[in-house]
Regions:
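Active-site neighborhood of HAD-like aspartate-dependent phosphohydrolases
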Residues: 1-43
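Asp-based, Mg2+/Mn2+-dependent phosphohydrolase catalytic module
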Residues: 1-4, 9, 100, 104-107, ...
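An amphipathic alpha-helix signature
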Residues: 22, 35, 39, 59, ...
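Hydrophobic alpha-helical core bundles mediating ligand binding, dimerization, or RNAP-core interactions
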Residues: 22-25, 42, 62, 86-90, ...
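Short helix-capping segments at alpha-helix termini
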Residues: 30-31, 72-79, 109, 132-136, ...
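A metal-dependent, Asp-based hydrolase signature
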Residues: 32, 46-84
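Short, acidic loop-to-helix structural element flanking the phosphoryl-transfer center
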Residues: 59-60, 78-115, 125, 153
Length: 222
């Protein structure tokens, strides 16, 4: 099997570390664990809209899910201020420690690097600039331009079309099994980043590669 020419990265949790979002919730008086509930809730709603043939921006869903979760909690500030503080945390996220080395190694191998996120490219731009890796990426793609969220086939088809390659000439890198499954069904090769050593769900199509860190990626697809 030939080496894929385009490496497509998911962004949220795959490259960016969402752990600090828990502290943002704590700073407004909400339990830290509500950060994970919030992120899962906004993904759920995005998937539901996609299944219904509709779409919405990540930021709008994030704010809506956040207001629902914060309702009734004894916050340390008013709801509008709490929402602004938490949503602002996305702009200050950093990449996981294994990401810069992995990105540099792949770039040095000659692979074309792009992103495909359910979020916004503006957030990715800022995170990558701080990490010093923005110049390694040919394009930062978002489903906002595809008109459909991952894991719908159209999202991956949009990335392939934009990069002028066949889906089989791309490898999707993600921590989310649902993203791996969606990409596989759309014809892409896949690499699952399993930093926490969790079992892969048997009801999803299995990844072509399983790695513990992005820094291992060049060794399997580069």
């Amino acid at each position: 099997m030939s080496t894929p020419s385009v490496v497509v990265f998911d962004v949220n949790e795959t490259l960016s570390d969402l752990t600090p979002m828990g502290q943002r919730f704590a700073e407004v008086g909400a339990p830290e664990w509500t950060a994970k509930l919030w992120f899962a809730s906004l993904l759920r709603d995005g998937f539901a809209l996609t299944a219904a043939g509709a779409t919405e921006r990540f930021s709008a869903l994030g704010e809506g899910a956040l207001r629902s979760i914060l309702a009734g909690l004894p916050l340390s500030r008013d709801t509008d201020a709490a929402v602004e503080h938490i949503m602002g945390g996305f702009l200050e996220l950093q990449v996981h420690p294994d990401v810069p080395e992995g990105v540099r190694s792949l770039s040095a191998s000659g692979a074309r690097l792009v992103t495909l996120t359910n979020g916004s490219t503006e957030v990715a731009e800022g995170i990558f600039a701080v990490a010093g890796i923005r110049h390694h990426f040919e394009r930062l793609l978002s489903v906002e331009d595809a008109g459909v969220w991952k894991p719908a086939p159209g999202a991956y088809a949009y990335a392939a079309s934009t990069c002028s390659v066949d889906p089989a000439d791309m490898v999707l890198v993600a921590v989310h099994p649902w993203d791996i499954d969606g990409a596989k069904r759309a014809g892409l090769r896949t690499a699952w980043v399993n930093r926490e050593g969790r079992p892969y769900p048997g009801y999803f199509l299995a990844p072509d590669h399983s790695i513990a860190a992005v820094s291992e990626l060049a060794g399997v697809v580069g």
